From Swiss-Prot:
Annotated segments matching region Interaction with substrate tRNA: 38-41
Annotated keywords: ATP-binding, Magnesium, Nucleotide-binding, Transferase, tRNA processing
The organism of origin for this protein: Cytophaga hutchinsonii (strain ATCC 33406 / DSM 1761 / CIP 103989 / NBRC 15051 / NCIMB 9469 / D465)
Residues annotated to bind ATP: 13-20
UniProt keyword annotation of Translocase present: no
Protein name: tRNA dimethylallyltransferase
Top-level EC class as recorded in UniProt: transferase
Underlying gene: miaA
Signal peptide span: none
Amino acid sequence: MSFINKYVIVVVGPTAAGKTALAVSLAKRFNTAVLSADSRQVFKELSIGTAKATMEEQDGVPHYFVDSISIEESFNAGMFEREGLQLLDTLFLKHDVVIVCGGTGLYVKALLEGMDALPQADPELREALNREFEQRGLEVMTGELKEIDPETHAVIDLKNPLRVFRAIEVYRQTGKPLSSFKTGAKQERPFKTIRIGLNMPREELYARIDRRMDRMLEAGLEKEARDNIQYRNYNALQTVGYSEIFGFIDGLYDREEMIRLLKRNSRRYAKRQLTWFSKDAEVKWFHPGEITEITTFIEAKLQE
């Protein structure tokens, strides 16, 4: 189905940059819906640690890929691409514009440009990597990844074992780094895109990240982690915001150190997000306070 005069407005950027607020504002302006391109917000059980928009923050705007499935179910970028394109087909029947908002770069790329062809996962090799993880720990394995594929090491979530395993797996299968499979070939989409990136001076961003982590802890982040501790080995919980709390629960460090790690790792995650999105030349960057400038830019693009 072709939607040559339909637009996807994409809002990307690092964690705590204000993406959700902008997406809701734009959705209300264009009377449309928001698709969340976030690999963890899709899970019903995870709300505080994923910075999921509350019903109040959603402000009546329909949100998709939020609270969609249980953490016991699997979800990945390929599924997001397939289901997202199907959903856009439906939404474009009544909307000229749809908003996509999120910080998971691979999900955004999959939806807008398609996925790079990669070798299929090898179950035996994956099992071997799991055993190595138990024996060596994640830090040693991320060190190995840095040696064999520094480009991938610079952009993936290093707190996420599945991402690290996959990169090492591809190298061991093929002798080539995962980054070498990224051809840059883009699949044609039947809609146009307007890509907005939010960023600010690093000191300001880091202060926002620290304040938001304080609010998350006040809102019950530790309880959320404890409530889901039976799923701690699931991909979604082996990420920033949860793994640090599990370390505290395990007695590896005290609460003060837990908070320090939560903030430090969130800042590191933001840096990796910026590294990823900065490679997309189509993204037009703004400070989140530049609402008028953002709106003017979008309106001009829609008139082209």
